[in-house]
Curated annotation (Swiss-Prot):
It comes from Homo sapiens (Human). Its EC number is 3.1.1.34, 3.1.1.32. Changing S159T: Loss of enzyme activity with triolein and tributyrin. This is Lipoprotein lipase. Changing S159G: Loss of enzyme activity with triolein and tributyrin. Homodimer. Interacts with GPIHBP1 with 1:1 stoichiometry. Interacts with APOC2; the interaction activates LPL activity in the presence of lipids. Interaction with heparan sulfate proteoglycans is required to protect LPL against loss of activity. Associates with lipoprotein particles in blood plasma. Interacts with LMF1 and SEL1L; interaction with SEL1L is required to prevent aggregation of newly synthesized LPL in the endoplasmic reticulum (ER), and for normal export of LPL from the ER to the extracellular space. It catalyses: a triacylglycerol + H2O = a diacylglycerol + a fatty acid + H(+); a 1,2-diacyl-sn-glycero-3-phosphocholine + H2O = a 2-acyl-sn-glycero-3-phosphocholine + a fatty acid + H(+); 1,2,3-tri-(9Z-octadecenoyl)-glycerol + H2O = di-(9Z)-octadecenoylglycerol + (9Z)-octadecenoate + H(+); 1,2-di-(9Z-octadecenoyl)-sn-glycero-3-phosphocholine + H2O = (9Z-octadecenoyl)-sn-glycero-3-phosphocholine + (9Z)-octadecenoate + H(+).
Length: 475
C-alpha cells in the first residue's frame, strides 16, 4: 500500500511539473508573439500623472495585475504626436490628471512611441502605421486574454497620434467605443486614403477638434478636411485667440517646420486644452453649431439646435452619427474656461436716400439680468439702405436674459470730407437677437419708434419690445 501511495504521489508531482512546464512554455510563446512591439503602454495613476511607473506588457498577463488595471472600468489611451525633443510634452500629465478627475476609477494609459516620434516629420508620419498596429495588438490581447470589452476603450490621439489611433481602431477585432482626434496632423494625411489616417470607420464614434488648419491643404499643421462623425472647428479652425499668428507664419516661411515647434504649439495644442476644459467644467460645456461654412457661421446664420444642429464640445459630446461628417463651429475665449455665449443679430437699415458704405465698424452693448457686455466691436463688409444684415457676436460672460442693447456706428480712422459736411445715417426700428446657448429669440424696439443711427454720433438705444408674441423661444 505504501509503495502504491508513493507511486501516486510521484505521478502527481510529475504531472504538476509537466503542466507548469507547458504553462511556462505557453507564456514564453505568448511573449514572443509580441516581442516586436516597440510602443510602450504605461498605466499612470491619479497620484502620479507625470511618470510612467508601471507598464502593461503585451503577452505578460502578470503585468496587468501588477499595475492594478481595473477590469470593470473604462480605459483611456492617450497617444502623443511628433516631438522635437524626444520627451513628453507638458500637456500629457495635464490631460491624464483631468481624465482621472472626471473618471476616478478609470484606467489612463499613455502610449509611448517617443523613439519613433522624434525622427524627421515624414519618417515619423510613416511610423504611425506601426504605432497603430502596436496599439491594436495590445487592445486585441486585452480582449482575448482578459475578455476586456472594447466598448470601454476610448482612444485620444493628438496630431500624428490621432492618425495612429485611427489606424489602431481599424485593426482591432471589434470596434472601440470612441476615438477623439485632437487636431490630427495635416502634412502627409490631407489627401491620404481612409485606411492610412483617422476616419469615421475607425470606432463606434469619432469626434475631431481642428484648431490649426491655416494654410493651403496639405501644408497646414492640422488636417483641414473632416475625418470624423463630428468635426468641430473652434474659431474657424484656422488659428486660436491668444496665439501670435504673425510670428508663426514668419518663422514657418523663413525656416520651415523644423524650428516652429514652440510657435505652433499654441494653436495646435489648443485642441488638447479645449478637451481638458470639457473634462474639468462639465456643467458648462461649450456649444458648437453645425454650419455649411465658417463664413455663414460668422453671419450668425447657424445658431440652431434643431435636429442635432448643435452639440457639446469635448467629453460630453452627443454621439450623433450622420451619413456625412458634420462640420461644426464655435467661438472661444483665449484661455480656460473657453466657453463663450453666441448671439445672432439682425438689423434692417432704412432710409429715404440710397446709401452704401463698405467695411464699416460698429460697437454693440448688451445688458441683461445677470451682467452686461459693452462695446463689442464688429465690422460689416457693406451697409446699404433698405437692406437687412445678419452677423455673429459673442460675450465672454453670461449676461442672463437680455433686456436692452445699444448700437454705435464708429467714425472712420481717417478723415473724410463727406463725413465732415454731412453725417451718414440710417433709421432703425427693430433689432432681432437670437441667443445660441438658450435658443431664445428677442426683439428690441427703439425707445422712440425709430432710432436714427448716425456715424460717429451717440449710440442708439433699444429695449425689449413689450409685445410678448414677438419674443419667444425657438429651436
Amino acid at each position: 500500500m505504501e509503495s502504491k501511495a508513493l507511486l501516486v504521489l510521484t505521478l502527481a508531482v510529475w504531472l504538476q511539473s509537466l503542466t507548469a512546464s507547458r504553462g511556462g512554455v505557453a507564456a514564453a510563446d505568448q511573449r514572443r508573439d509580441f516581442i516586436d512591439i516597440e510602443s510602450k503602454f504605461a498605466l499612470r495613476t491619479p497620484e502620479d500623472t507625470a511618470e510612467d511607473t508601471c507598464h502593461l506588457i503585451p503577452g505578460v498577463a502578470e503585468s496587468v495585475a501588477t499595475c492594478h488595471f481595473n477590469h470593470s472600468s473604462k480605459t483611456f489611451m492617450v497617444i502623443h504626436g511628433w516631438t522635437v525633443t524626444g520627451m513628453y510634452e507638458s500637456w500629457v500629465p495635464k490631460l491624464v490628471a483631468a481624465l482621472y478627475k472626471r473618471e476616478p476609477d478609470s484606467n489612463v494609459i499613455v502610449v509611448d512611441w517617443l523613439s519613433r516620434a522624434q525622427e524627421h516629420y515624414p519618417v515619423s508620419a510613416g511610423y504611425t502605421k506601426l504605432v497603430g498596429q502596436d496599439v491594436a495588438r495590445f487592445i486585441n490581447w486585452m480582449e482575448e486574454e482578459f475578455n476586456y470589452p472594447l466598448d470601454n476603450v476610448h482612444l485620444l490621439g493628438y496630431s500624428l497620434g490621432a492618425h495612429a489611433a485611427g489606424i489602431a481602431g481599424s485593426l482591432t477585432n471589434k470596434k472601440v467605443n470612441r476615438i477623439t482626434g485632437l487636431d490630427p496632423a495635416g502634412p502627409n494625411f490631407e489627401y491620404a486614403e481612409a485606411p492610412s489616417r483617422l476616419s469615421p470607420d475607425d470606432a463606434d464614434f469619432v469626434d475631431v477638434l481642428h484648431t490649426f488648419t491655416r494654410g493651403s491643404p496639405g501644408r497646414s499643421i492640422g488636417i483641414q478636411k473632416p475625418v470624423g462623425h463630428v468635426d468641430i472647428y473652434p474659431n474657424g479652425g484656422t488659428f486660436q485667440p491668444g496665439c501670435n499668428i504673425g510670428e508663426a507664419i514668419r518663422v514657418i516661411a523663413e525656416r520651415g517646420l523644423g524650428d516652429v515647434d514652440q510657435l505652433v504649439k499654441c494653436s495646435h495644442e489648443r485642441s488638447i486644452h479645449l478637451f481638458i476644459d470639457s473634462l474639468l467644467n462639465e456643467e458648462n460645456p461649450s456649444k458648437a453649431y453645425r454650419c455649411s461654412s465658417k463664413e455663414a457661421f460668422e453671419k450668425g446664420l447657424c445658431l440652431s439646435c434643431r435636429k442635432n444642429r448643435c452639440n457639446n464640445l469635448g467629453y460630453e459630446i452627443n454621439k450623433v452619427r450622420a451619413k456625412r461628417s458634420s462640420k461644426m463651429y464655435l467661438k472661444t475665449r483665449s484661455q480656460m474656461p473657453y466657453k463663450v455665449f453666441h448671439y445672432q443679430v439682425k438689423i434692417h437699415f432704412s432710409g429715404t436716400e440710397s446709401e452704401t458704405h463698405t467695411n464699416q465698424a460698429f460697437e454693440i452693448s448688451l445688458y441683461g439680468t445677470v451682467a452686461e457686455s459693452e462695446n463689442i466691436p464688429f465690422t460689416l463688409p457693406e451697409v446699404s439702405t433698405n437692406k437687412t444684415y445678419s452677423f455673429l457676436i459673442y460675450t465672454e460672460v453670461d449676461i442672463g436674459e437680455l433686456l436692452m442693447l445699444k448700437l454705435k456706428w464708429k467714425s472712420d480712422s481717417y478723415f473724410s470730407w463727406s463725413d465732415w459736411w454731412s453725417s451718414p445715417g440710417f433709421a432703425i426700428q427693430k433689432i432681432r437677437v437670437k441667443a445660441g446657448e438658450t435658443q431664445k429669440k428677442v426683439i428690441f424696439c427703439s425707445r422712440e419708434k425709430v432710432s436714427h443711427l448716425q456715424k460717429g454720433k451717440a449710440p442708439a438705444v433699444f429695449v425689449k419690445c413689450h409685445d410678448k408674441s414677438l419674443n419667444k423661444k425657438s429651436g
